[in-house]
Amino acid sequence: MKLFPIFSDIKGRCVLVVGGGAVATRKAQALLEAGAAVSVGAPTLTPELARLAQGQTITHLQGEFDADWLKDAWLIIAATDDRTVNTRVYEAACARRQFCNVVDDPALSSFQVPSIVDRSPLIVAISSSGLAPVLARRLRERLESLFDHSLGALAELAARYRPAIRAARADLKERRRFYDWLLDGPVAAALRRAQPQQAQEALDEALARPALSQDGRVVLVGAGPGDPGLLTLKGLRALNEADVILHDRLVSAEVLALARRDAERITVGKRLGENHNATQARIHELMVEHARAGRRVVRLKGGDAFIFGRGGEELEHLRAHGVDYEVVPGITAALACAAYAGIPLTHRDYAQSVHLVTAHCRADEEALDWDGLARGQQTLAFYMGVGQLDILSARLVAHGRPGSTPFALIENGSRPSQRVVMGRLSQLAERAREQAVASPALLIVGEVAALADRLAWFGKP
């Protein structure tokens, strides 16, 4: 271990920053956040530092570096763009046995400032010992995405309740189990939703019970259309915490690869020709079964669970069986596929509204308002329509939509294998057969579909 990691309490202590530029400004602001009494030594200051000095938030030591500036300093940071000045600062600090950091110069530093992930009071520090600061910064960025911003509030709540938890759970093993529940259960979930009152109530109720509930919970997560980069941060965190993942067949392997490695993965997607109601009933059973076994369950759906994903039915089943749940929205296929094809769903010249339509209904196609769908100045996005293209185009034309209306069929939208087949509405079924378009594919009908010709950026239309 090249460096010894240490966290320092600098509240009220004098910290000297030598330099008045942008880097010095960032360092001074970070030190102020930690409660330090900051002095900045420099001939001139950035507007932000000048404002802080004018408001007496910092002390400005004006002029060229003077070793006398160090006499009251507890820590020193040299942040000038002149290595000669930085060397003088470092040597003066060493002569007085004071810790000094020269920004981006490990050879002239007796301590280094790490990259941090701040979820105060929880702080994670990352250091490459000054050898690879870009790598440390990249790791910090990844950790930022994994650590929910509610962790600080959770740590503060746990600290506030520590005496009560110790009193209610005298046995060490029971206390550890309680803390595991606190970190993984409804208290943490409420804080993630920015509901501190509900979190406190859940904690009070748990402390009043002689034993913890063994029930788990279900998180309904929208995985997006395929590109793993479109998974939300909340969705990623849920996958990293899951014990069991019940996923549809359309969820990409790349998204599943982001999940916790030891999580049990169960494919529950429906196949063409299956009894979908029976399959859905089995999904309901699995969610309840695993949650009641105390497991954290992620129900992972392609796109967004509430856009033609039967997410509402699944929540109704969970509510009826008393299972706790949470919903993490996803990017639905219409939004993502259109964007990846270069198609703006609305455009002031062509479309003032968007209709999301499923071509796979409980009843037949007569359930749709074809007169309304055939009107102009709107965009239609049809889900699950590959097997209904003849009917869709014929109905739209019969109800007044011109056969010359542009369409775009987007197959495997947002994935490396994405294809976009374009044409006129009267040619829809024929073009799809010629190009052997297969599911999953999204159909967009409207003047905006033609824009893919000149706005495409991901692959080629």
UniProtKB/Swiss-Prot annotation:
Pfam families: CysG_dimeriser, NAD_binding_7, Sirohm_synth_M, TP_methylase. This is Siroheme synthase. InterPro entries: 4pyrrol_Mease, 4pyrrol_Methylase_sf, 4pyrrole_Mease_sub1, 4pyrrole_Mease_sub2, CobA/CysG_C, NAD(P)-bd_dom_sf, Siro_Cobalamin_biosynth, Sirohaem_synt_dimer_dom_sf. Transmembrane segments: none annotated. The active site is at residues 248, 270. In the N-terminal section; belongs to the precorrin-2 dehydrogenase / sirohydrochlorin ferrochelatase family. In the C-terminal section; belongs to the precorrin methyltransferase family. The modification Phosphoserine is found at residue 128. Its EC number is 2.1.1.107, 1.3.1.76, 4.99.1.4. One of its GO terms (molecular function) is NAD binding. Residues 1-203 are annotated as: Precorrin-2 dehydrogenase /sirohydrochlorin ferrochelatase.
